[in-house]
Amino acid sequence: MTIRNYNYHMTHFVISAPDIRHLPRDEGIEVAFAGRSNAGKSSALNTLTNQKGLARTSKTPGRTQLINLFEVVDGVRLVDLPGYGYAEVPEEMKLKWQRALGEYLQKRNCLKGLVVLMDIRHPLKDLDQQMITWAVAVGTPVLLLLTKADKLASGARKAQLNLVREAIIPFMGDIQVEAFSSLKKIGVDKLREKLDTWFSEIPPEVMAEEFDGEGE
């Protein structure tokens, strides 16, 4: 497989949807970003794309309730899933979000990879593990980003990284773990490399459409 290098700076917003029934047709290829409400998911997307306002960062964790789609090129999309695990959100809303997340991960056929973001100081909370379990169950590869890595000294960061790598072995899935910091740009290259790999598995029909478009 030839790895294609994508220009993530060209990524643009497409649509916000409450559930998978309101998303575009289930075709092309998608990589989803998931994490607790305070894990730094929006900041990671903004850093990846070098666009400060692409994904809205909220001062009130738990405010983002929709599935947000961003297009890199035709048929290649990044998906910002609703943040989870915020204590002050009503229980009914929590359950609604969890249903939407589970349904997307289990039923969206064009999903080819899942990026789960966790604060490096508080990794693998129950809902993080649930996301990983859902992904592994349907054979979706996972990249775990331990965010806010700049909050730890180099030695402590490496120790925490190794601890999480040991802890995820029982999940028995295709799971990679990397340290990440939007502020210090730690792990951004690793994220881009993984996305390029996943997106290089793009279906032939999408590649054909891109090629036809370039010839116009």
UniProtKB/Swiss-Prot annotation:
Task of the protein: Necessary for normal cell division and for the maintenance of normal septation.
InterPro entries assigned to the protein according to its UniProt record, in alphabetical order: G_ENGB_dom, GTP-bd, GTP-bd_ribosome_bio_YsxC, P-loop_NTPase
Keywords: Cell cycle, Cell division, GTP-binding, Magnesium, Metal-binding, Nucleotide-binding, Septation
GO biological process terms, semicolon-separated: division septum assembly
Name listed for the protein in its UniProt record: Probable GTP-binding protein EngB
CDD domains assigned: YihA_EngB (cd01876)
Family: Belongs to the TRAFAC class TrmE-Era-EngA-EngB-Septin-like GTPase superfamily. EngB GTPase family.
Residues reported to bind Mg(2+): 42, 64
GO terms for MF: GTP binding; metal ion binding
Cofactor(s) for this UniProt protein: Mg(2+)
Domain EngB-type G: start-end pairs: 27-201
Protein residues bound to GTP: 35-42, 62-66, 80-83, 147-150, 180-182
GO cellular-component term (any): cytosol
Gene: engB
Domain of life from the UniProt record: Bacteria
A Pfam family per the record: MMR_HSR1
Record has Cell division as a keyword: yes
Gene3D superfamilies: P-loop containing nucleotide triphosphate hydrolases (3.40.50.300)
